[in-house]
């Protein structure tokens, strides 16, 4: 049985754990320094004016702290927060109920906002710009629109795929902030802090080892820490040492660069089955037995960041670094790798 620890979504138990270790003030939020510095200025200015903060769009790979920052924004504004997700807002009435229940200055947090149905999304336009919504009553010849005023509020939207947002929705966010992957040093500090909350010590070398294999993602670092805690408790060890951390990571088959079994399967497929690419996302998903959306949203961003995959108009291609590591034939490194122009997001 394959254990996919790195890339699985947060479950209920993990969500409760994240709530326990979640910082509640901007000064306690580790990383994303420029982003948080700017937000502090915007929040302070809004409070000085007595206005609601401009609507905020938080984008970036999963597990980097978008939900945490949404709660911090509400806390810094001294406001309440209502949280939901795009897939749950399947009817306009669900959104209308949330909007009409907001008090002045409240924060409405919509996770996975790119998955909100277009018909529901359109209700947000007037709510975000004019703080009103138009509700249709009855149907057919007797149908009529009723305009409801709502209190000024701040919408915080989180997305892992900002490119899927419609232009009208994206244009209504006054603050657009993108999350970057974390450095190993920052992850090490996050691990040490979380270990104190878990009630088990971790030495510096162990924290560094876990941080180095966490793919630049705090959520993954915390998952690995919890698994290392399990190994330490079974071994009746009062402290997570480097030896225990190494045993944990080896048993979970997570290598020095944080790649797990599925990452390696994806790379092996591109390099050896498709001769380095290009290969389309749909073909790749079928070959590895994974959903296309999961490939694009969960696995691919880190593989691109790590320099193993490049995206082109004709599909994914393996880089020379990938060929050197994953090719079963040394001669594979001689093939043309970048015949096609890179997409815009690869130039950044």
UniProtKB/Swiss-Prot annotation:
Compartment(s) of residence: Cytoplasm
Keywords: ATP-binding, Cytoplasm, DNA damage, DNA recombination, DNA repair, DNA-binding, Hydrolase, Nucleotide-binding
EC number in record: 3.6.4.-
Record region (Large ATPase domain (RuvB-L)): 1-182
Any GO BP: DNA recombination
Record bears the keyword Signal: no
Family annotation (InterPro entries): AAA+_ATPase (IPR003593), AAA_lid_4 (IPR041445), DNA_helicase_Holl-junc_RuvB (IPR004605), P-loop_NTPase (IPR027417), RuvB-like_N (IPR008824), RuvB_C (IPR008823), WH-like_DNA-bd_sf (IPR036388), WH_DNA-bd_sf (IPR036390)
Recorded superkingdom: Bacteria
Chain segments carrying region Head domain (RuvB-H): 256-348
Residue numbers binding DNA: 311, 316
GO MF terms held by the record: ATP binding; ATP hydrolysis activity; four-way junction DNA binding; four-way junction helicase activity
Quaternary assembly: Homohexamer. Forms an RuvA(8)-RuvB(12)-Holliday junction (HJ) complex. HJ DNA is sandwiched between 2 RuvA tetramers; dsDNA enters through RuvA and exits via RuvB. An RuvB hexamer assembles on each DNA strand where it exits the tetramer. Each RuvB hexamer is contacted by two RuvA subunits (via domain III) on 2 adjacent RuvB subunits; this complex drives branch migration. In the full resolvosome a probable DNA-RuvA(4)-RuvB(12)-RuvC(2) complex forms which resolves the HJ.
Entry comment, domain topic: Has 3 domains, the large (RuvB-L) and small ATPase (RuvB-S) domains and the C-terminal head (RuvB-H) domain. The head domain binds DNA, while the ATPase domains jointly bind ATP, ADP or are empty depending on the state of the subunit in the translocation cycle. During a single DNA translocation step the structure of each domain remains the same, but their relative positions change.
Role: The RuvA-RuvB-RuvC complex processes Holliday junction (HJ) DNA during genetic recombination and DNA repair, while the RuvA-RuvB complex plays an important role in the rescue of blocked DNA replication forks via replication fork reversal (RFR). RuvA specifically binds to HJ cruciform DNA, conferring on it an open structure. The RuvB hexamer acts as an ATP-dependent pump, pulling dsDNA into and through the RuvAB complex. RuvB forms 2 homohexamers on either side of HJ DNA bound by 1 or 2 RuvA tetramers; 4 subunits per hexamer contact DNA at a time.
The family this protein is said to belong to: Belongs to the RuvB family.
PANTHER family cross-referenced by the UniProt entry: HOLLIDAY JUNCTION BRANCH MIGRATION COMPLEX SUBUNIT RUVB (PTHR42848:SF1), PTHR42848
Name of this chain's protein: Holliday junction branch migration complex subunit RuvB
Species this protein is from: Chlorobium limicola (strain DSM 245 / NBRC 103803 / 6330)
Underlying gene: ruvB
């Amino acid at each position: 049985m394959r254990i996919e620890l790195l890339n699985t979504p947060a479950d209920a138990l993990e969500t409760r754990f994240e709530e326990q270790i979640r910082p509640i003030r901007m000064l306690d939020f580790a990383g994303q320094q420029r982003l948080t510095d700017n937000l502090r200025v915007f929040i302070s200015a809004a409070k000085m004016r007595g206005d609601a903060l401009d609507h905020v769009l938080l984008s970036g790979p999963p597990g980097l702290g978008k939900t945490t920052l949404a709660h911090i924004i509400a806390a810094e504004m001294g406001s309440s927060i209502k949280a939901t997700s795009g897939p749950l807002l399947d009817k306009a009435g669900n959104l209308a109920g949330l909007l009409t229940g907001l008090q002045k200055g409240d924060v409405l947090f919509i996770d996975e906002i790119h998955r909100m149905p277009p018909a529901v999304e359109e209700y947000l336009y007037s709510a975000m710009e004019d703080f009103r919504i138009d509700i249709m009553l009855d149907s057919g010849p007797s149908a009529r629109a009723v305009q409801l005023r709502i209190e000024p509020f701040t919408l915080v939207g989180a997305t892992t795929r900002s490119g899927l947002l419609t232009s009208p929705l994206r244009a209504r966010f006054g603050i657009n902030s993108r999350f970057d992957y974390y450095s190993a040093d920052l992850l090490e500090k996050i691990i040490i802090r979380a270990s104190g909350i878990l009630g088990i010590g971790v030495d510096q070398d162990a924290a560094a080892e876990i941080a180095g294999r966490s793919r630049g993602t705090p959520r993954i670092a915390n998952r690995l820490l919890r698994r290392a805690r399990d190994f330490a408790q079974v071994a009746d060890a009062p402290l997570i040492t480097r030896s225990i951390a190494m045993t944990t990571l080896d048993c979970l088959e997570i290598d020095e660069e944080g790649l797990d079994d599925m990452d390696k399967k994806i790379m092996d497929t591109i390099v050896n089955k498709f001769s380095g690419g290009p290969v389309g996302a749909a073909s790749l998903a079928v070959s590895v037995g994974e959903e296309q959306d999961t490939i694009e949203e969960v696995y691919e961003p880190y593989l691109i960041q790590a320099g193993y995959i490049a995206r082109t108009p004709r599909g994914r291609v393996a880089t020379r670094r990938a060929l050197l590591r994953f090719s079963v034939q040394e001669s594979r490194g001689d093939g043309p790798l970048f015949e096609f122009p890179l997409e815009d997001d690869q130039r950044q």
